[in-house]
């Protein structure tokens, strides 16, 4: 909602189609009367009613809703079948926020006159405002089938398609309203609100040059109007044009200093440019001006994390949570910071809280499962991932993780089924193929295992698990000459894994390369001893099954974040 005198135009904003189009509808009703014939006295009555309805529309424009309603009801009482009267009464209800009553009157008007452009356009606005975009689109499309030049319906339809992500169609509609010519420039008299909407659509459609030209024009037309400059800055920031957005926010700040929303958005844009010092100053100012707002604190936490200041980051996010308890992004980032700093158990409740507050984020489930995987709690990890798979059945990643956890439990059939579901959604995934190859090898299907593992390596020449498992398989099959180059490539990828050195020791021994074998055995013993001292009792060497030693893992648990994860938070608008 607009605050502090600023006007915001966003993808869900709708032009008001109300009184003016009702007036147009009166003329239309004369052409499409609900009565097939009228005698002279009936015609006179209708003329009087039209005059009365125009008077009501004028009163409504003047803000005198009660007087307008009284006239509209009198007209309806005298002529219950008069569609325009029902339409006007619907507008009155609409302006009062009585959506159900307004919709009833619009639909009654359309029942009486299915070609009432005004009623259909007004119904479309109401449907969009009450979060029924598909019905609203249908309504506006119907308006344009009756009146192809209806500018408000064209504009609103363009915004609805933009909100749906169909930017090319949105651009075509908005260009039609703006009268865009071959040089992609709207008519000189085009409303700035429309130009801003069109610029946003261009940015989302990847039409950067058109967006830049239009932004130049908007900025020039805006002069020193902070509302327009700020709104244009928001549009550009949303389109990742942060450099130019920063300049517009700085101009806005100079024209309207000490506005927290301006400083907040300036800080966010600077953060996205990695200008962390400047971003922190802007956000600190925003936080000081709006101490009850958690968003600047949240962003300051991201900056502290990026600066490798975990304690400061956690303090900012905890303060943000003290201001807004239901803040899934803050809970998630606290968990990320703790997890990144090897405090997985402390992170777990924050991940769980983030999921409970916003179960629509797949990444939250992935990270919570990773906490369990790190502790080899495969059953708990699988439970988390299966919950996510139920919510995100089309995610290849989550089915892969279900399989990963099932493999850790030693449930190879369940793991195979999950991996195959993942592969069906995302063919040629080398990690999934490597896992399927491992499972085939464990079940004695050696030809299938070799084929799958070689395919994984062909797709990803640096896939360590595929190299390890293929080398181990070839050693098992006594194909030592073939195994050696595979295992040597694997050890070049990870020199710290004991299992790979044990396999090399075995291959060198069978090939009578005593010096190489002794070297690899010594390395194996040293690494294994270090592993045991480190508290990891996982088996090594050729032991398969559910132990999942480092050399035998399909791939490491989900990568730990090295920097704050990207969390989409809507820009704050004054």
Model-derived segments and spans:
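Terminal, low-structured helical/coil segments at or just beyond the last alpha-helical repeat
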Residues: 28-41, 183, 188-192, 213, ...
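Alpha-helical adaptor scaffolds
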Residues: 91, 107, 125, 431-434, ...
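Structural signature of tandem alpha-helical TPR/SEL1-like repeats
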Residues: 61-74, 95-108, 118, 129-142, ...
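Alpha-helical segment of the N-proximal tetratricopeptide repeat
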Residues: 47-81, 88-91, 95, 200, ...
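Helix-start (N-cap) detector for alpha-helical repeat units in TPR-like alpha-solenoids
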Residues: 49, 83-84, 117-118, 151-152, ...
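Structural marker of alpha-solenoid helical repeat scaffolds
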Residues: 78, 112, 146, 180, ...
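Long, contiguous interaction/recruitment modules in multidomain scaffold/adaptor proteins
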Residues: 5, 10-45, 152-156, 163, ...
């Amino acid at each position: 909602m607009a605050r502090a005198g600023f006007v915001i135009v966003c993808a869900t904003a709708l032009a008001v189609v109300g009184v003016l189009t009702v007036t147009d509808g009166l003329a239309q009703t004369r052409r499409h009367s609900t009565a097939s014939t009228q005698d002279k006295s009936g015609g006179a009555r209708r003329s009087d009613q039209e005059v009365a309805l125009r008077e009501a529309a004028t009163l409504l424009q003047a803000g005198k809703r009660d007087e307008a309603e009284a006239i509209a009801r009198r007209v309806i009482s005298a002529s219950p079948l008069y569609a325009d009267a029902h339409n006007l009464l619907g507008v009155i209800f609409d302006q009062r926020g009585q959506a159900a009553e307004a919709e009833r009157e619009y639909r009654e008007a359309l029942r009486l006159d299915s070609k009432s452009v005004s009623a259909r356009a007004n119904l479309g606005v109401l449907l969009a405002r009450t979060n029924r975009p598909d019905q609203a689109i249908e309504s506006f499309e119907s308006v344009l089938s009756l009146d192809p030049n209806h500018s408000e319906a064209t504009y609103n339809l363009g915004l609805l398609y933009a909100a749906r992500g169909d930017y090319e169609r949105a651009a075509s509609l908005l260009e039609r309203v703006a009268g865009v010519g071959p040089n992609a420039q709207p008519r000189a008299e085009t409303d700035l609100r429309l130009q801003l909407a069109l610029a946003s659509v261009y940015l989302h459609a990847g039409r950067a040059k058109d967006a830049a030209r239009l932004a130049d024009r908007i900025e020039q037309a805006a002069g020193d109007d902070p509302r327009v400059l700020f709104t244009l800055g928001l549009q550009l920031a949303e389109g990742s044009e942060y450099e130019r957005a920063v300049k517009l926010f700085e101009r806005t700040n100079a024209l309207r200093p000490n506005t927290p929303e301006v400083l907040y958005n300036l800080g966010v844009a600077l953060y996205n440019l990695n200008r962390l010092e400047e971003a922190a100053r802007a956000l600190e100012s925003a936080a000081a001006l709006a101490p009850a707002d958690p968003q600047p604190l949240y962003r300051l936490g991201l900056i502290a994390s990026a600066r490798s200041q975990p304690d400061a980051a956690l303090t900012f996010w905890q303060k943000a949570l003290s201001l807004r308890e239901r803040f899934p992004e803050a809970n998630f980032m606290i968990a990320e910071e703790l997890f990144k700093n090897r405090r997985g158990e402390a992170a777990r409740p924050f991940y769980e809280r983030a999921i409970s507050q916003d179960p629509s984020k797949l990444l939250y489930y992935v990270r919570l499962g990773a906490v369990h995987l790190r502790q080899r709690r495969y059953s708990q990890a699988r439970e988390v991932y299966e919950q996510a798979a139920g919510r995100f059945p089309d995610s290849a990643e989550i089915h892969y993780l279900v399989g990963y956890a099932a493999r850790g439990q030693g449930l190879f059939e369940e793991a195979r089924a999950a991996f195959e579901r993942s592969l069906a959604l995302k063919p040629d995934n080398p990690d999934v193929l490597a896992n399927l190859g491992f499972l085939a090898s464990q079940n004695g299907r050696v030809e299938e295992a070799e084929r799958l593992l070689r395919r994984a390596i062909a797709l990803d020449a640096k896939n360590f698990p595929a190299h390890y498992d293929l080398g181990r398989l070839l050693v098992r099959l006594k194909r030592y000459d073939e195994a050696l180059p595979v295992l040597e490539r694997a050890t070049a990828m990870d020199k710290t894994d004991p299992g790979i050195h044990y396999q090399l020791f075995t291959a060198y021994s069978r090939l009578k390369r005593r010096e190489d074998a002794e070297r690899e055995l010594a390395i194996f013993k040293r690494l294994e001893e270090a592993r045991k001292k480190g508290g990891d009792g996982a088996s090594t060497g050729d032991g398969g099954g559910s132990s999942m030693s480092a050399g035998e893992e399909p791939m490491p648990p989900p990568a730990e974040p090295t920097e704050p994860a990207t969390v989409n938070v809507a820009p704050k608008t004054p």
